[in-house]
């Protein structure tokens, strides 16, 4: 155990920015530039990670087209003259004008006092609305997520190359993406490129086709840029071999299957989820303190991005509903990167003006359009009211986002990696794996036999919800409900003695690794608890 850490004295700043995404980083950058060197004592940026992720290129990391360091930029180098604090926001106390943050394992919670508060915390990922998705779906929101997806795909290829059972191989070579927005479509396109390019290096996969399946709940992909371009993106992806399922909602996910529209299912061991955005709990708590009604999970603001009745509270980005004059029509700004970075810059300028006794200006932005890649040398675009697709759209996507990528060194690295990709195959080396969860959760659908008699025992289970039955011919069934442990009582010589089947939709915790070795040594967590 580490030595006890004494409580830290509170920190104090004139301006405290919460969130290190586009809005928060560009706000800090603007303030640091306008206030100069003195800003380091007056302005602080609190972020969970010390680097800003350039999300438009994140899918290319998952597809092994770019290295992870190409899409992150250190906040301390980006936000000059600003104090960057790596910590997680625990609580915002608006009445006390303070924020409680968690700095890490060896520090106590830190209190930070402020005069002006800028909330740019964005949204969170919540997959719990689909049974099993939290346990078996991989989100796509961070560099860690992208690397995890890349590792999973390459691991599936390696396992499929070794498998002799054709049905097992088919499940291993089926990659399912849920959600047909920007993240889902761009990630699906990158995975398709990676898998198609990699198969030639796996000698045993020539006769088993890989499947990349995209499931979307709406009638068109990329509804943000209109049905015409969404339909074009669909045609391009289908022409390249992707399966696209529209007007379909996912109902359940397990380690070997995904179910949609209640009765349809796909055998797969790889599920990538681009759905599940949910309001940030800290933002919702702040709204409750202020007595204001969130707008679809976002803080409503004035055009200046101040919260009505609270001139020292500002909000921007995905967690803020910012009014926007779209050529004479008032709308709420969409939660996209191009709006977030401009909102952040405007807040920085507004706060600098208010500190000088001047008035804050409203947020204005002339919408330029949107672009999305759908694979190698293919993209769709809506720019200045014009819609087009193909190579020109792809070239424009790369040119525009390369220009927006922070840091000259990163621009040069991305140019090199893109050039390298045109000439050589994508990298199939497995990145260093993250430390696994010692007790991960797993979900089983009703009727699923997830262990068969004679299988090697690689883990024990504790049932969290549902009902699991252990069966063997000529023997009485055993039933395991919530709180029950399925352990060595069901094994013999390292093999399972019975089939394990989920009678109803069930969740369980897995014990493996050192915990499994301890249990195999004879330690029982609780009596079998079978009934």
Label the predicted regions.
Residues 4, 135-166, 257, 265-340:
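FAD-site-proximal beta/loop scaffold in flavoenzymes
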Residues 2-91, 175-176, 185-225:
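Beta1-alpha1 glycine-rich phosphate/pyrophosphate-binding loop at the start
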Residues 2-12, 83-176, 272:
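FAD-binding core/adjacent interface of flavoenzyme oxidoreductases
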Residues 23, 122-125, 188, 277-279:
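Short glycine-rich anion-binding loops that position phosphate/pyrophosphate groups of nucleotides
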Residues 1-3, 10, 339, 346-433, ...:
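C-terminal, flexible cofactor-proximal segment of oxidoreductases
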Residues 82-101, 105, 192-303, 307-309, ...:
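A Rossmann-like FAD-binding core segment of flavoenzymes
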Residues 169-225, 229-235, 243-245, 333-372:
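Rossmann-like dinucleotide-binding core of oxidoreductases
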Residues 443, 448-505, 513-519:
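Cyclic nucleotide-binding regulatory domains
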């Amino acid at each position: 155990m580490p030595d006890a850490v004494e409580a830290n004295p509170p920190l104090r700043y004139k301006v405290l920015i919460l969130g290190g995404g586009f809005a928060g980083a560009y706000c800090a950058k603007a303030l640091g530039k306008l206030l100069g060197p003195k800003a380091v004592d007056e302005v602080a940026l609190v972020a969970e990670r010390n680097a800003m992720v350039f999300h438009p290129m994140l899918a290319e990391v998952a597809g092994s087209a770019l290295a992870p360091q190409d899409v992150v930029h250190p906040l301390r180098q980006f936000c000059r003259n600003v104090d960057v604090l790596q910590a997680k926001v625990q609580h915002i106390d608006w009445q006390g004008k303070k924020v409680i943050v968690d700095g890490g394992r060896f520090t106590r919670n830190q209190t930070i006092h402020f005069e002006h508060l800028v909330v740019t915390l964005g949204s969170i990922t919540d997959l719990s609305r689909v049974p099993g998705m939290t346990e078996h779906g991989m989100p796509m929101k961070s560099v860690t997520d992208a690397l995890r997806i890349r590792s999973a795909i390459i691991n599936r290829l390696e396992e499929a190359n070794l498998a002799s059972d054709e049905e097992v191989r088919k499940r291993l070579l089926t990659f399912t993406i849920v959600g047909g927005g920007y993240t889902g479509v761009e990630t699906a396109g990158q995975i398709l490129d990676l898998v198609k390019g990699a198969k030639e290096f796996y000698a045993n996969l020539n006769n088993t086709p890989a499947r990349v399946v995209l499931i979307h709940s709406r009638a068109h992909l990329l509804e943000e840029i209109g049905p015409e371009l969404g339909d074009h993106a669909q045609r391009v992806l289908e022409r390249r071999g992707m399966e696209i399922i529209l007007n379909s909602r996912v109902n359940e996910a397990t380690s070997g299957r995904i179910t949609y529209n209640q009765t349809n299912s796909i055998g797969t061991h790889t599920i990538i989820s681009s759905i599940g955005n949910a309001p940030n709990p800290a933002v919702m708590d702040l709204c409750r303190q202020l007595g204001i009604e969130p707008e679809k999970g976002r803080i409503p603001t004035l055009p200046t991005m101040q919260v009505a009745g609270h001139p020292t509270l500002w909000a921007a980005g995905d967690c803020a509903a910012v009014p926007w004059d779209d050529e004479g029509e008032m709308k709420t700004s969409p939660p996209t990167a191009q709006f977030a970075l401009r909102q952040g810059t405007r807040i920085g300028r507004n706060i600098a003006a208010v500190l000088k006794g001047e008035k804050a200006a409203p947020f204005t932005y002339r919408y330029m359009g949107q672009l999305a890649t759908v694979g190698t040398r293919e993209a769709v675009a809506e720019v200045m009211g014009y819609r087009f697709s193909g190579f020109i759209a792809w070239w424009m996507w790369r040119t525009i986002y390369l220009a927006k990528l922070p840091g000259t060194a990163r621009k040069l690295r991305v140019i090199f990696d893109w050039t390298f990709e045109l000439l050589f195959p994508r990298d199939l080396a497995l990145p260093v794996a993250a430390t696994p969860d010692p007790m991960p959760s797993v979900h089983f659908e009703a009727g699923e036999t997830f262990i068969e008699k004679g299988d090697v025992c690689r883990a024990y289970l504790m049932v969290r919800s549902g009902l699991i039955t252990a069966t063997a011919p000529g023997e009485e069934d055993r039933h395991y409900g919530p709180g029950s442990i399925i352990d060595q009582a069901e094994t013999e010589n390292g093999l399972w003695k019975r089939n394990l089947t989920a009678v109803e939709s069930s969740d369980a915790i897995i014990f493996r690794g050192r915990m499994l070795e301890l249990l195999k040594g004879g330690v029982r967590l609780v009596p079998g608890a079978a009934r």
